[in-house]
Amino acid sequence: MQRRIQQEVAGGERPDTLLLLEHPHVYTLGRRGRDSDILVDEARLAELGAEVHHIDRGGEVTYHGPGQLVGYPIINLLRHGGGPLKYVRTLERTLIATLSEFGVKAESEDRPTGVWVGERKIASIGVKVNRGVTTHGFALNVDPDLTYFDHIIACGMPDVATTSMSRELGHHVSVDDAIAAFMPHFGRMFGFELSQVEPTSVQSTLIDTPLPE
């Protein structure tokens, strides 16, 4: 779906699009990811109910799963100005502003890419830009099962600790609550007027549309 939307955004057939979702348990390896960064065998992965996918974003290996807000902004940077670095920094600021709504003090300066609470990573970012249009995006730990990170060398950093909004606050936070806080900040940071559509509306426009070569 991402690839098809990216083609349509690049061709001016679709407006910039933001996909927000939760994944089932999955480990994804970016272009710099290594199979050795996954520390368990296939039998253990099956017990965990987790799949492994090699994808074309930047970065190494990370985990996605229930309780995590994953966002795929598919944006034409050529229309909005700024390159990939500015885009990533704007994503970081958007996530930091979102976390501040809940009283979580986060930062990104002088750190590896992503968003951090002290020495603990709370959000990961991995993107790709093709024909000036972004794909992939970010993953914000709202209230996932953080033990899934124990089975990988997350983001290529063996000693990195992960955290979540719920762990930092000491109570449950829902992904829906995180989305409600994130959307206004995303619109403000990127200068968008946002309109929400149901997933079926996005899918129905893609069903019979041939993918451009």
Spans of model-derived segments:
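Short, charged/polar low-complexity linear motifs in solvent-exposed/disordered segments
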Residues: 45-46, 88-90, 141-142, 167, ...
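N-terminal lobe of the biotin/lipoate ligase/transferase fold
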Residues: 1-116, 121-122, 147, 172-173, ...
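C-terminal accessory segment of soluble enzyme catalytic cores
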Residues: 147-213
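Residues at secondary-structure transition points
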Residues: 36-39, 71, 132, 143, ...
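Catalytic cores of processing enzymes, dominated by hydrolases/peptidases
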Residues: 117-163, 167-170
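Catalytic-loop motifs flanking and including active-site residues across diverse enzymes
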Residues: 67, 134, 178
